[in-house]
């Protein structure tokens, strides 16, 4: 597990490791150093994902024993690194940005997410846009993409 952890530590940005450590610590209510299925569901939602029960059970099965921080980091880094690249996500938003302002009407985005593709629920929508950069009804997809991918590049 130590070998796996060192690999994880080199491929994740330090900021993301720190965020995951803080999240893990918040979940480990009894401070025993381990997380269970309910804890995993809560942390997934904090990270912007809504896994189903089957996925959570599968994640716990990936750990050879009780889920401590090292195993947690290893498992979640695989899940997080399995997402699209920052550029891919930004380009997907850009397809709807006809004026090339790097901003989209937030109501338009919400309508797309509710009625097309994954059909987001109201709760999923709330979780997704809870900390999204929205000013004057305009959603800044460049900042949002940097935020969800952990690059922290706000000046793009």
Curated annotation (Swiss-Prot):
**Extra remark beyond the main annotation:** This chain binds calcium.
What are the protein's UniProt keywords?
Answer: Calcium, Metal-binding, Motor protein, Muscle protein, Myosin, Repeat
State what this protein does. Answer: In molluscan muscle, calcium regulation is associated with myosin rather than with actin. Muscle myosin contains two types of light chains: the catalytic light chain, essential for ATPase activity, and the regulatory light chain, a calcium-binding protein responsible for Ca(2+) dependent binding and Ca(2+) dependent Mg-ATPase activity.
Q: Which GO terms describe its cellular component?
A: myosin complex
This protein's name: Myosin regulatory light chain, striated adductor muscle
Q: What is the lineage of its organism?
A: Eukaryota, Metazoa, Spiralia, Lophotrochozoa, Mollusca
Q: Which domain of life is it from?
A: Eukaryota
Where does the chain bind Ca(2+)? 28, 30, 32, 39
Among Gene3D superfamilies, the record links this protein to: EF-hand (1.10.238.10)
Ranges for domain EF-hand come to: 15-50, 84-119
Coiled coil regions in record: none
Pfam families for this protein? EF-hand_7
Residues bearing Blocked amino end (Ala) are 1
Q: Which InterPro entries match?
A: EF-hand-dom_pair (IPR011992), EF_Hand_1_Ca_BS (IPR018247), EF_hand_dom (IPR002048), Myosin_RLC (IPR050403)
Species of provenance = Chlamys nipponensis akazara (Akazara scallop)
Q: Which GO terms describe its molecular function?
A: calcium ion binding
């Amino acid at each position: 597990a130590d070998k796996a952890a060192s690999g994880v530590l080199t491929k994740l940005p330090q900021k993301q490791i720190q965020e995951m450590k803080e999240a893990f610590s918040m979940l480990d209510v009894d401070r025993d150093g381990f997380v269970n299925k309910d804890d995993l569901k809560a942390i997934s939602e904090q990270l912007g994902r809504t896994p189903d029960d089957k996925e959570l059970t599968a994640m716990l099965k990936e750990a050879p024993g009780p889920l401590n921080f090292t195993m947690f980091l290893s498992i979640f880094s695989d899940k997080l690194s399995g997402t699209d690249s920052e550029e891919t996500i930004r380009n997907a938003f850009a397809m709807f940005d006809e004026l090339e302002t790097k901003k989209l009407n937030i109501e338009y985005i919400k309508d797309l997410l509710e009625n097309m593709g994954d059909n987001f629920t109201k709760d999923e929508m709330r979780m997704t846009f809870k900390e999204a950069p929205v000013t004057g009804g305009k959603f800044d997809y460049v900042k949002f993409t940097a935020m969800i991918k952990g690059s922290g590049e706000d000046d793009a």
